[in-house]
Amino acid sequence: MIRKTSVLRSNFIGIYAKAWDDVAFITMMADEKTVADFQEVLQVDVRRISIDNSSLIGTMMVMNSNGLIVPYGSEITGLGDLDGRNVLQLKDKINAIGNDIIANDHGAIIHKNFSNRSRKEIEDTLGVETIRTTIGNILTVGSAGILTSKGMLVNPETDDDELEFLRDFFKVSVKSGTANFGSIYVGASIVANSKGVLVGKDTTPIEMDRIDDVLS
């Protein structure tokens, strides 16, 4: 299932929310209709949270089935039970965790400037191998792609060799494309898990077909 929605009247819904196959988190300020969209499409428990009183929770967290990572010293409200996941408050000069890490249960790509210590902590928390690289020449890899346990959409600057590498590394189908009427920052424009996909309201029918094809 794929559906258009907005969060706080923004079509860049990925900066306000994060999802996996068993739970989704959304800004505390989201309205009831938006939360209902997330519940119906993603088919998971949707929890309103805040991180350091910010609504931009999608930029500040990453998770897979094994773990969840937020910036060091974060005050989190509404997180609830995480079903045995490892939880890491990562101490690094890079603190936009959701923008700078993209992961599933097979691997994680991280920003090139993470320290060696941080890289080891990320691997231990998420239970996967990590690689420091870019996606389509974008350093903020979490904003350059959207990844689930079934598929991955990356920005259109990603070349064929890179697409093949991503397929092998994450063990999912991978395609390039845009959302929100041509935005290359698909991670900021989409929230998805293996059950459904939410996209910003500016996303065109052609974009939706491509997104649905690779993620649904």
UniProtKB/Swiss-Prot annotation:
Xref: SUPFAM superfamilies: Pentein (SSF55909)
Signal peptide: none
A GO molecular-function descriptor: translation initiation factor activity
InterPro entries assigned: eIF6 (IPR002769)
Alphabetic keyword roster: Initiation factor, Protein biosynthesis
Pfam families assigned: eIF-6 (PF01912)
BP GO terms, sorted: cytosolic ribosome assembly
Recorded family membership: Belongs to the eIF-6 family.
Reported function: Binds to the 50S ribosomal subunit and prevents its association with the 30S ribosomal subunit to form the 70S initiation complex.
Name of this protein: Translation initiation factor 6
Lineage, broadest ranks: Archaea, Methanobacteriati, Thermoplasmatota, Thermoplasmata, Thermoplasmatales
